[in-house]
A protein has these predicted regions:
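Long, positively charged amphipathic alpha-helical accessory segments at protein N-termini or as interdomain linkers
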Residues: 117-141, 145, 169-207
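A glycine-rich, hydrophobic loop/mini-helix early in the fold
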Residues: 56-105
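Short loop segments at secondary-structure junctions
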Residues: 53-54, 93-96, 160, 184-187
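Aromatic/basic-lined ligand-recognition segments
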Residues: 150-167
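Internal, conserved structured core segments that host functional sites
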Residues: 84-152
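Active-site loop/lid in soluble adenylation, ligation, and acyl-transfer enzymes
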Residues: 1-61, 69-73, 79, 146, ...
Length: 207
């Protein structure tokens, strides 16, 4: 896979509203400058983020996280409990394609899912983890939590989903952000991360 050139940001832990605001500002910036921006970040406290089309009342479906602050993402998909994970965002000018991507062979900005997720699969392979794209699960989109859903662009390790992403298009730009589960959170103990799969990684090897 050919490399792409992006402005790289690595931010310290910040509250949910700040993290979401920064991602939206970066998307707006890309629409003006045409230069892609890749950002890695974490959260200052366990936070539940709702997909754009989820209702705030739906958080009652996950009582374990009712004590956590809640924010709404600009992107769709299921809710995510941001705790022991690494979050990334990629803001990209919609009119541009990286080397090796055929506009006729890709649907809209779907190439970004494959590009980013395959890059992570390659990094994990170097660390000894055999991650793969997930097989879609029928009916899983009804689940409240993102990591209880499966699409063909998600990344799994064995039968465990470890990476999910979502997108939003805005004027001349596309925002894609996603979460990589490093280990299970006490608020979502049923969702295993890399640590439970035998790969107790910190943030440095991945960023």
């Amino acid at each position: 896979m050919e490399q792409i050139v992006c402005q790289l940001l690595t931010d310290p832990p910040m509250p949910g509203p700040v993290n979401m605001a920064v991602d939206e500002v970066l998307l707006e910036t890309v629409t003006r400058t045409g230069s892609p921006i890749l950002r890695f970040y974490t959260w200052s406290e366990p936070t539940l983020s709702l997909g754009y089309f989820q209702l705030f009342s739906e958080r009652e479906r996950h009582p374990e996280s009712l004590s956590c602050p809640v924010v709404r993402r600009a992107t769709g998909g299921g809710a995510i409990l941001h705790d022991r994970e690494l979050t990334y965002s990629l803001s990209w000018p919609r009119r541009e394609l990286p080397p090796g991507v055929d506009r006729k062979a890709t649907k809209g900005s779907e190439w970004m899912y494959e590009w980013v997720h395959q890059s992570l699969i390659d990094v994990l392979a170097e660390l000894g983890a055999d991650a793969q794209f997930c097989k879609p699960t029928a009916g899983a989109e009804k689940s409240f939590l993102c990591f209880e859903r499966r699409s063909g662009w998600d990344v799994g390790l064995g039968d465990v989903k470890i990476l999910g992403s979502a997108q939003r298009s805005y004027r001349g730009g596309v925002l894609q952000h996603g979460s990589l589960l490093l280990s299970a959170s006490p608020f979502t103990p049923q969702l295993a991360g890399l640590s439970e799969q035998g790969f107790p990684l910190g943030l440095d090897p991945l960023t």
